[in-house]
Amino acid sequence: MARYRVHVNDPLDKEATQLLMNKEELEVTSEHLEKDELMKIIPEVDVLVVRSATKVTADIIEAGKNLKIIARAGIGLDNIDVQKAKEKGIKVLNTPGASAPSVAELAMGLMLACARHIARATVSLKEGKWEKKALKGKELLGKTLGLIGFGNIGQEVAKRALAFGMKIIAYDPAKPETDLPVEYVDLDTLFKESDFISLHVPLTESTRHIINRESIAKMKDGVIIVNTARGGTIDEEALYEEVVSGKVYAAGLDVFEVEPPTDEIRRKLLSLDNVVATPHIGASTAEAQRRVGIELVEKIFKELGI
C-alpha cells in the first residue's frame, strides 16, 4: 500500500520516473500543473519533484501540509523558497554534480564558438559568403581562463581547459581543495588577468550583476565572457554596451536575466554578431538527464527510508 504521494511537476528522465513508480510505497503522479492547479493538489503531496520551470513559492509550501521533500532535478535552487521550506521543516534536495560534465562541455563550446566565430561563420557560409579574413579568431592555447566559482562545474571546466593549454585562475570564497593546477585569486585580480572569464556561481545577492560596468572596466581589452551559470549574474545592458564598444571581444550566453530573452535589452544583445547564445541547455543532454534523475530518486528513497 502506498505510504507517500509523489508529484512530478516537471519532466524527469523516464528511467528515473519508472524507479519511482516501481516502489509500492509510493503513489506517483506526473503532470505539469500551473500554480493554481498545483495549489489544489499540494495539500495531499508528500514529495514534490520540479525542475526550473516550476516556481515553488512560499504560499505553495505553506499549503503543502503533508509536504516532506521538495526535490529539484538539477543544481539551482533559485526557483524554490528555500528559507520557507526550512521554516516548515521540509527537506530540499538537488543534484549539484550530476549535470556538471554536460554544463562544462557547453561552456567550452561557447568559448570556442566565441574565439573562432563559429556561429557567425556558419551563417555567413550558408548565405553564400566566403569571409575568411573577417573571421580571424583567437586561440585558447596559452590564454588565462578566470573561473568565477570553483565548485563541481568550475572544476570540470578547468579539467577541459587545461587540455587546451590554458592557465587557470579562480575566484571562490570557499577555496575548495583540488589537485588541479589552479591559482586562487581575488575578484579584481581575476578581472585584470583573464583573457576568458566563465561564470559558475548560483544567483544570490552577492553574485547578482557580479559582471557589471565597473568590473568590465577592470578587464583586459578583448576579453571573452561566458555564462552557463545563472541569468542575473551579468548586467546584460552593460554587457551589450561593452560588446558594442569592443572592450568585450565576444560573449557566450546560455542563461539570461529574463528567460525567454524577449525583452528589448536581451533582443539587442542577441542581435550582435559576436554574441553566441543558447536557450539554457547546459544540462540538456541524455546522459546528464539520466544521471540527474537517478541521483534525485535515490536521494528521495534515502530521505523517506524506503
From Swiss-Prot:
NAD(+) binds at residues 152-153, 172, 228-230, 254, 280-283. Pfam families: 2-Hacid_dh (PF00389), 2-Hacid_dh_C (PF02826). SUPFAM superfamilies: Formate/glycerate dehydrogenase catalytic domain-like (SSF52283), NAD(P)-binding Rossmann-fold domains (SSF51735). The active site is at residues 230, 259, 280. One of its GO terms (biological process) is L-serine biosynthetic process. It catalyses: (R)-glycerate + NAD(+) = 3-hydroxypyruvate + NADH + H(+); (R)-glycerate + NADP(+) = 3-hydroxypyruvate + NADPH + H(+). It is an enzyme of class 1 (oxidoreductase). InterPro entries: D-2-hydroxyacid_DH (IPR050857), D-isomer_2_OHA_DH_cat_dom (IPR006139), D-isomer_DH_CS (IPR029753), D-isomer_DH_NAD-bd (IPR006140), NAD(P)-bd_dom_sf (IPR036291). Signal peptide: none annotated. Keywords: NAD, Oxidoreductase. One of its GO terms (molecular function) is hydroxypyruvate reductase (NADPH) activity. Its EC number is 1.1.1.81. It comes from the Bacteria. Involved in the degradation of L-serine via 3-hydroxypyruvate. Catalyzes the non-reversible reduction of 3-hydroxypyruvate to yield D-glycerate. Belongs to the D-isomer specific 2-hydroxyacid dehydrogenase family. This is Hydroxypyruvate reductase. It comes from Thermotoga maritima (strain ATCC 43589 / DSM 3109 / JCM 10099 / NBRC 100826 / MSB8).
